[in-house]
Amino acid sequence: MTTEEFEKKAESGKLILVDFFATWCGPCQMMTPIIEKIKEKYEKDEKAEVLTIDIDENPAIPARFSVMSVPSFVYIKDGKAVDTVIGATTEDNLVDRIEKLKK
């Protein structure tokens, strides 16, 4: 995903959960099936979307949100970070935050 594509989504009015990851990161690999499941759950949701950003492929996006470690999960609404989870976590934690923040 290019920075331009990301900006368009970030400014869309939807709540965006961004999974910042790296291919060399063990905890990131552990989170992949959880993120895929959440991504599928919100695929048709008009108020929320899940994106994954490889920090090595596009370092400008994580830099914008001061991402210093992976995995990091940043919730973005109207182009601004509204919540962050750093490190591996549970599906329930990520989904509960989506539901709370997308309203």
Language-model-detected regions and their locations in the chain:
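Short pre-active-site segment immediately N-terminal to redox-active cysteine/selenocysteine motifs
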Residues: 14, 21-24, 69
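A short beta-strand-turn-helix
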Residues: 1-15, 59
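Structural microenvironment flanking redox-active thiols in thiol-disulfide oxidoreductases
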Residues: 53-61
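Hydrophobic beta-strand anchors of alpha/beta hydrolase catalytic cores
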Residues: 17-18, 50, 73
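Structural micro-motif
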Residues: 65-74
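The canonical Cys-X-X-Cys-His
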Residues: 25-28, 73
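Non-catalytic, surface beta->alpha helical segment in thiol-disulfide oxidoreductase systems
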Residues: 74-103
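Typically the conserved alpha-helix immediately C-terminal to a functionally engaged Cys/Sec
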Residues: 29-44
